[in-house]
Amino acid sequence: MNTLQKGFTLIELMIVIAIVGILAAVALPAYQDYTARAQVSEAILLAEGQKSAVTEYYLNHGEWPSNNTSAGVASSTDIKGKYVQSVEVKNGVVTATMASSNVNNEIKGKKLSLWAKRQDGSVKWFCGQPVKRNDTATTNDDVKADTAANGKQIDTKHLPSTCRDAASAG
C-alpha cells in the first residue's frame, strides 16, 4: 500500500522551529551589543568635538581648562545627543554621560572619558573609562579612575578598541 505524503510531518516542523529558536537566541544578544556600541559611538563623537578647544586652551594658558566655560565650549547639558545626556569638561578631562532613557539598558547613565597628556611638545589624547584630574595646573598630567563613577563605567565590550585606555595610559 503506497500512500503519497503531502506537506510536512509534525517532527519536521518541530525541528525547523527548534533551529529558528537557536538562531534567534544567538542573534538577539549580538544585535543588542551592536546597538549599544553604535550608541556609545555618539558619545565619543560628541566628546571628541571638545578636544580641539581643550587643547587650544592648554597651549594658550599652560594649564588645563577647569570647566566647559573656560574651555570655550557650550555648557555640559547643551552638548547632548539622542543617546547622550551631557558632555562635561573638568580639569581638561572630557566626560560624556549616556542618557537614562531611549538607550540600551546596558549603557544607561554610564560614562566614558577622553583626556590628554603632554608628549614631546604636543598633546596626546586617550579614551576609556571615566577618569578625573585633580588639578588644572598639574605638572605630570596624571589622571586617576573616577571613583565617584563606580558602577557607571561602560562595559569594555561596548567601547571601540581605540577607546580602551587605562587611567595610567601614557
Swiss-Prot record:
PROSITE patterns: PROKAR_NTER_METHYL. The keyword Translocase does not apply. This is Fimbrial protein. Belongs to the N-Me-Phe pilin family. O-linked glycan consists of GlcNAc-Gal disaccharide. The lineage of its organism: Bacteria, Pseudomonadati, Pseudomonadota, Betaproteobacteria, Neisseriales. One of its GO terms (cellular component) is membrane. It is found in: Fimbrium; Membrane.
